[in-house]
Design a protein with these regions (language model features):
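Short Fe-S-cluster ligation motifs
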Residues: 1-19, 41-71
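N-terminal Rossmann-like dinucleotide/flavin-binding domain of flavoprotein oxidoreductases
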Residues: 1-4, 18, 37, 104-154
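Iron-sulfur (Fe-S) cluster-binding segments and ferredoxin-like electron-carrier domains
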Residues: 18-44
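Rossmann-like dinucleotide/flavin-binding elements
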Residues: 70-94, 135-145, 164-166, 185-215
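Glycine-rich FAD pyrophosphate-binding loop
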Residues: 89-105
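Conserved beta-strand segments of alpha/beta enzyme cores
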Residues: 90, 130-132, 179
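Redox-cofactor binding/interface segments in oxidoreductases and associated redox assembly factors
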Residues: 156-159, 182, 208
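Flavin (primarily FAD) binding-site architecture
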Residues: 160-176, 180-181
């Protein structure tokens, strides 16, 4: 599993299992429970909290002398950094938020995806493989592609997400009234309050429009 991607424990908890609905094993008795199998392996044979990493995946010490900056510490950025580090590339990850995991750390509640599991598979894996993670570094504000290249990085991988809330598109819709917010923006505000201590308050009755995961 780890030869492909480093997020087995996280995916084993929150994956929506599209592959299982198309699994040909259903014609015999039932789909292969790949989601739970990955979670079991990750939880039992891959002790995240102990910092143990399979010997066959130990990276060479900056074997090719290359340096790569990865913008974004979500699943895409972490997976990119993971494979680069395993191939001996020096990697530094720059994340706008104060924690790794991308929207998974903001939009998925802890009872479904524990924060320590996500942190271990993102920041933890990168650091164990010799990479660095910088928080509070927003592209276009704190860092730039040209600036990173000028600092000696050979390449820059852009892995920032699209964490911007959408509107309903109804008549007279405007985000200006007090208390009006998209679901994504609301989750981001709550996350910043809980994790970073930024001010946030919620008063009165609340109406949630929608019935999906964000809602």
């Amino acid at each position: 599993i780890l030869e492909k991607y480093p997020l087995a424990a996280s995916c084993g908890r929150v994956c929506v299992r599209f592959c299982e609905s198309a699994c040909r094993r259903q014609t015999v008795d039932g789909a292969v429970g790949i989601k739970m199998l990955k979670r079991f392996v990750a939880d039992q044979a891959y002790p995240l909290a102990e910092g143990v990493f399979p010997k066959n995946l130990t990276p060479p010490a900056n074997a090719n002398k290359k340096r790569v900056a990865v913008i974004g510490a979500g699943p895409a950025g972490v997976t990119c950094a993971y494979h680069l580090l395993l191939n001996g590339v020096a990697v530094e990850v720059f994340e706008a938020q104060q924690t790794s995991g991308g929207m998974a750390s903001v939009g998925i509640p802890s009872y479904r995806l524990p924060k320590d599991v996500l942190k271990a598979e993102t920041e933890g894996v990168i650091k164990r493989l010799g990479g660095k993670v910088h928080y509070g570094k927003r592209l276009g504000q704190d860092i730039s592609v040209d600036g990173l290249l000028a600092r000696g990085f050979d390449s820059v991988f852009l892995a920032f997400g699209c964490s911007k809330g959408g509107m309903l598109g109804i008549q007279n819709e405007t985000p200006t009234p007090k208390g009006y917010s998209s679901g994504i923006d609301f989750l981001l505000d709550v996350h910043k309050h809980v994790e970073c201590g930024e001010p946030f308050s919620l008063e009165g009755e609340v109406v949630v429009v929608g019935g999906g995961n964000v809602a």
